[in-house]
């Protein structure tokens, strides 16, 4: 009997040790053990890839980055989400964009959904979180945020941010909003609790500027959960270093952009911005590859 009890206590001891180790990993923000270096651990490698990449340069590809408004659909979305309660009517563009980003990030957590939504538009995605699953991935976050910004009268888009490594299956999708007050784009991420980047003066940065800061080594601040700024090597800081090697965006954007009901997607072009000397990979049929960063980040046309 004593031997039996000894075995039982031994089993409980092992379980206790494993539980303690598991808790320690969770407290440190890790949910799995990996034989590969973490994203933060590879930050220097990602920055070197950016620094060794070819420059962006003008080419012969003609681009017309365009945003198409639909007043009827805009009103439907404003009324459904009661957007006028999120911000003051006379607020500036960035204040409105932040309010929308916070709204999405607060209400919808990140997850890689097991069931794909039947429709990819703001209202149906919101209904999906109530009826099917409460969370979804970065692309769906960005589509929802894009349509809310568009309904609020903001010029916005969603951009796929991609790594150098063709065997890295992880990319990230974020939004950019055009700030007419500053004459520039600004990145805003409504996924993973929300985030944006700024220079040390607090001016929000575009994806182009974020990439340039990594290359130059100039300090910038990330604002996790749209809150207090930090220059520390956070997960976001390292993650975006990996995923700002090249970019993808639709040339023309509007509501229902990646929904079966949309017609613009069928006629629109898929634009890929790559550094010189890099061919990209996984380019969709009909996609346009360019090295012209000025055209890619030009003011949107209407």
Language model features by range: what are they?
Residues 216-302:
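Low-complexity, Gly/Ser/Thr/Pro-rich intrinsically disordered linker/tail segments
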Residues 143-216:
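Hydrophobic/aromatic-rich core segments of domains that either
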Residues 16-36:
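Membrane-interface motif at the C-terminal end of an N-terminal transmembrane signal
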Residues 14-17, 100, 104, 131-160, ...:
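Cysteine-centered nucleophilic/redox motifs
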Residues 26, 31-32, 147-150, 259, ...:
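A structural boundary/capping signal
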Residues 1-17, 23-24:
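N-terminal Sec-pathway targeting helices
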Residues 34-44:
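N-terminal pre-domain segments of enzymes
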Residues 42-136, 299-300:
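Secondary-structure boundary elements
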């Amino acid at each position: 009997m004593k031997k039996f009890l000894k075995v039982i206590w031994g089993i409980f001891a092992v379980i206790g040790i494993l539980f303690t180790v598991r808790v320690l990993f969770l407290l440190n923000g890790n949910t799995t053990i990996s034989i590969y270096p973490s994203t933060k651990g590879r930050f220097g490698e990602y920055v070197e890839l950016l620094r060794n990449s070819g420059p962006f340069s003008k080419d012969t590809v003609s681009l017309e980055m365009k945003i198409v408004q639909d007043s009827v659909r805009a009103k439907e979305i404003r009324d459904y989400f009661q957007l006028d309660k999120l911000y003051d009517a006379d607020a500036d563009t960035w204040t409105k964009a932040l309010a929308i980003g916070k709204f999405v990030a607060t209400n919808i957590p990140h997850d890689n959904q097991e069931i794909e939504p039947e429709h990819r538009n703001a209202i149906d995605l919101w209904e999906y979180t109530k009826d099917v699953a409460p969370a979804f991935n970065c692309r769906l976050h960005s589509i929802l945020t894009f349509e809310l910004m568009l309904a609020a009268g903001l010029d916005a888009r969603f951009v796929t941010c991609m790594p150098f490594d063709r065997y890295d299956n992880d990319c990230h999708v974020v939004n950019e909003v055009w700030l007419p007050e500053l004459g520039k784009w600004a990145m805003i991420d409504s996924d993973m609790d929300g985030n944006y980047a700024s220079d040390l003066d607090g001016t929000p940065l575009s994806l182009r500027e974020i990439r340039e800061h990594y290359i130059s080594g100039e300090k910038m601040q990330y604002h996790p959960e749209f809150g207090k700024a930090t220059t520390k090597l956070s997960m976001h800081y390292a993650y975006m270093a990996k995923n700002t090697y090249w970019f993808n965006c639709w040339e023309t954007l509007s509501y229902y952009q990646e929904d079966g009901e949309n017609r613009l997607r069928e006629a629109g072009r898929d634009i890929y911005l790559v550094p010189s000397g890099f061919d990209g990979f996984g380019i969709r049929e009909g996609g346009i590859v360019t090295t012209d960063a000025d055209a890619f980040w030009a003011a949107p046309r209407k």
